[in-house]
């Protein structure tokens, strides 16, 4: 029997949630591949991708879950929140309804996620300034009220996309992992569970391929 080699030191499950059409899939595509697709079809159910970061000679594997925003997929997508220790909750700055629905998404995540987690509130499509329906101040106030980080991004022109993901992971690393041992129950499609032990972490230094800023509520 051949044993599989674990190709990472730490595993971090992050979900990207929010209404349909706010740009979740393009945010992930821009972060992972620096690509943007005009007219990209809405996600059906859940899509999955990974990204590995090298920090202090440790490999950090991110599981990035892109969840559908349509109501009919709720029963499917909520099951994938289990074990998540991070979330990007996304709204469209040019769509008031997507902002009004943030409470719903936040509640669903907190009911299903790991007991310790970090959340980044993302006001996407900042390139649509002339059509803005949600002010930057409103986004900041919502984030502060619910103890989240906040940033405005544009998947179209890539503004702040990498910063949004990296600041979230930075917050998780320093606030949840640093000098603390915790076991993460990673649920893989509801079939296989693996326990990843995280502990005794030192302050991180990303290699030259990645930029990390200390977590802040106002980062744009």
Swiss-Prot record:
Record lineage: Eukaryota, Amoebozoa, Evosea, Eumycetozoa, Dictyostelia
The entry's keywords: Cell membrane, GTP-binding, Lipoprotein, Membrane, Nucleotide-binding, Prenylation, Protein transport, Transport
Lipid-substituted positions (S-geranylgeranyl cysteine): 219-220
GO BP term, pick one: small GTPase-mediated signal transduction
UniProt cross-references to Gene3D superfamilies, sorted A to Z: P-loop containing nucleotide triphosphate hydrolases
Cellular localization per UniProt: Cell membrane
InterPro entries: P-loop_NTPase, Rab_GTPases_membrane_traffic, Small_GTP-bd, Small_GTPase
Membrane topology recorded in Swiss-Prot or TrEMBL: Lipid-anchor
Family per similarity comment: Belongs to the small GTPase superfamily. Rab family.
Organism: Dictyostelium discoideum
The protein's name in its UniProt record: Ras-related protein Rab-11B
Record-linked NCBIfam families: small_GTP (TIGR00231)
Transmembrane segments: none
Effect of inactivating the gene: Mutants exhibit normal growth and development, and endocytosis and the structure of membrane-bound organelles is unaffected.
Motif mapping: Effector region: 40-48
Binding-site positions, GTP: 18-25, 66-70, 124-127
Pfam families to which the protein is assigned, alphabetical: Ras
Example of a GO MF term: nucleotide binding
GO CC annotations, alphabetized: endomembrane system; plasma membrane
